[in-house]
């Protein structure tokens, strides 16, 4: 795996870290934790590539990317619901996020379906809340995972960098969208 692959993984980590910090400071803890999980995947990917521990860290990187992604997206959805006035306890939101990640671990084919369904729900809820930036970000991520990720047409290098660049852009859109919404009740 070429060293330059670490650049866009690091970008994901930086954007997610910044977004998580900003969301935490504005009392959006579920969204902050959701972004932090995506950032953790970026950190692990960056360490994996720059350290040369490609194979030893492969399963950890894949697991955190996929299962952390499911849990992170569930937490983003929970924050959207909380911002819409639903009294959703933190324990319930965390429990659902963990349960969905466990389900995806037990049935890997279901993980991709869950991710797509949650993205569609996030688009709809963001549009309903008039959070156009958030909706655009979630829609971009939906297109990213269906058209860009591991695309045979783009080649390995371009596919990797474009995918991670779009993930970082999605996280930025989502964070900025949450920051424009009122504080959770």
Where are these regions (language model features)?
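Polytopic alpha-helical membrane-helix bundles and their juxtamembrane interface segments
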Residues: 1-37, 46-63, 73-185
């Amino acid at each position: 795996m070429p060293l330059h692959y670490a650049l866009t993984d690091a970008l994901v980590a930086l954007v997610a870290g910044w977004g998580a910090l900003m969301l935490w400071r504005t009392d959006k803890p579920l969204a902050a934790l959701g972004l932090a999980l995506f950032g953790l995947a970026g950190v692990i990917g960056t360490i994996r590539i720059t350290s040369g521990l490609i194979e030893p860290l492969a399963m950890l990187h894949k697991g955190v990317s996929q299962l952390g992604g499911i849990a992170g997206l569930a937490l983003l959805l929970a924050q959207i619901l909380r911002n819409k006035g639903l009294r959703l306890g933190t324990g319930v939101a965390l429990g659902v996020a963990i349960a969905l990640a466990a389900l995806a671990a037990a049935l890997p084919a279901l993980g991709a379906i869950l991710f797509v369904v949650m993205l569609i729900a996030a688009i709809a809820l963001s549009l309903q809340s008039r959070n156009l930036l958030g909706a655009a970000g979630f829609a971009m991520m939906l297109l990213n995972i269906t058209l860009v990720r591991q695309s045979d047409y783009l080649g390995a290098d371009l596919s990797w960098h474009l995918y991670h660049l779009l993930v970082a852009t999605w996280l930025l859109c989502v964070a900025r969208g949450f920051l424009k919404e009122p504080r959770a009740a």
